[in-house]
């Protein structure tokens, strides 16, 4: 036998509200938020990477790698030094 206790007995402060009615069923929780997965082109990402980058005669560049970083350094024709450090 299922005996339900009135809401006013379980929660006496609800008596302070006028015309309060206990919901028939609990309100469902919103769905968990998750970031959308990025869409990729049909090409495989590994096809886009070159194991050894081509050397440009106009703007030579160097690459240095460590266990957790990749560094690219180039010198433009104007003499500007460009450095890029990617931390993995």
Swiss-Prot record:
Alphabetical keyword list: Early protein, Host cytoplasm, Host G2/M cell cycle arrest by virus, Host nucleus, Host-virus interaction, Modulation of host cell cycle by virus, Phosphoprotein
Any one of the GO CC terms: host cell nucleus
Highest taxon, organism lineage: Viruses
GO biological process: symbiont-mediated arrest of host cell cycle during G2/M transition
Chief place where the protein resides: host cell
Disordered: region residues: 21-59
Post-translational modification: Phosphorylated by host ERK. The phosphorylation triggers a structural change that enhances keratin binding and protein stability.
Compartmental location: Host cytoplasm; Host nucleus
Physiological role: Contributes to multiple aspects of the viral life cycle including viral genome amplification, suppression of suprabasal cell differentiation and egress of newly formed virions. Induces host cell cycle arrest at the G2 phase by associating with and preventing the nuclear entry of host CDK1/cyclin B1 complexes. Inhibits cellular DNA replication by preventing loading of host replication licensing proteins MCM2 and MCM7 onto chromatin. Within the cytoplasm, associates with host kinase SRPK1, a splicing factor regulator, and inhibits its activity.
Other comments on record: The major E4 form is first synthesized as an E1^E4 fusion protein from spliced E1^E4 transcripts, such that the first few amino acids of the E4 protein are derived from the N terminus of E1.
Subunit field text: Assembles into oligomeric complexes. Interacts with host CDK1. Interacts with host SRPK1; this interaction may favor expression of late viral transcripts. Interacts with host cytokeratin components KRT8 and KRT18.
Family, per entry: Belongs to the papillomaviridae E4 protein family.
Name assigned to this protein: Protein E4
